[in-house]
Amino acid sequence: MLKRTMGRLLLTSLVITGLAGTIDDNSISKKERKYAIGLMKETRDEAINSTKNLSEAQLNYKAAPEKWSVKECMYHIAGAEKLLWGMFESNMKGAANPEKRSEIKVTDEQFVKMVQDRSNKLQAPEPIQPKNTGFTSITEAIEDFKKNRGEHIKYLKSSTEDMRNHVVQMPFGWIDCYQLCLMIAAHSNRHTQQLNEVKADAGFPKQ
């Protein structure tokens, strides 16, 4: 009888302190987790594979003076990965604001397509202009990108945080922090497309 009572007390204690995993678990759904992780992995591989086996001439080629080279696209992708994740962490540390969810006007899929749409041209913020990222070689940028993306995927695999109820106001409208994760992946795809446009240019060096 005493053992049974002690067992119940221990279980109650675990639940109250959250160690039993039933409190403060505001996880995204399995479907949402799978979608975000899949997008993170797919867009990571696309970006890295698009830079393989290129010469210095190919990495530095610009279709026009004001255009970015392959190397500069990769600098921007890697720099934005850190900047956007910093934004994500900052907003997750703040108070949840579920009352702002009504301000979100796009589904996850619509938002990803919007970010990836290259017909909608935008000016990159100064801190993630290629010249301001601090990278000195494409190898350095790729390694930094791989490391950070790996950490972000690891977070998404295990996080129980309430991403949906941390809502962020962006220049284009309101999104939640789960969608901000999707934005990180979609953004790298957007600029991988740009990188591939450079490679498809008629003047791109053959070697």
Regions found by a protein language model. Name each.
Residues 42-52, 82, 86, 119-123, ...:
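Generic structural signal for well-ordered, non-membrane alpha-helices
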Residues 36, 43, 47, 69-70, ...:
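Stable alpha-helical elements in mature extracytoplasmic
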Residues 12-35, 86-143, 202-207:
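Short, helix-capping/interhelical loops that line the mouth of catalytic, cofactor-
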Residues 118-184:
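A charged, solvent-exposed segment within the mature domains of Sec-exported extracytoplasmic proteins
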Residues 61-110, 154-207:
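Short, contiguous alpha-helical
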Residues 26-67:
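Start-of-domain marker
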Residues 39, 50, 87, 91, ...:
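Residues that form generic nucleotide/phosphate-binding pockets
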Residues 1-10:
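Bacterial N-terminal signal peptides that target proteins for export
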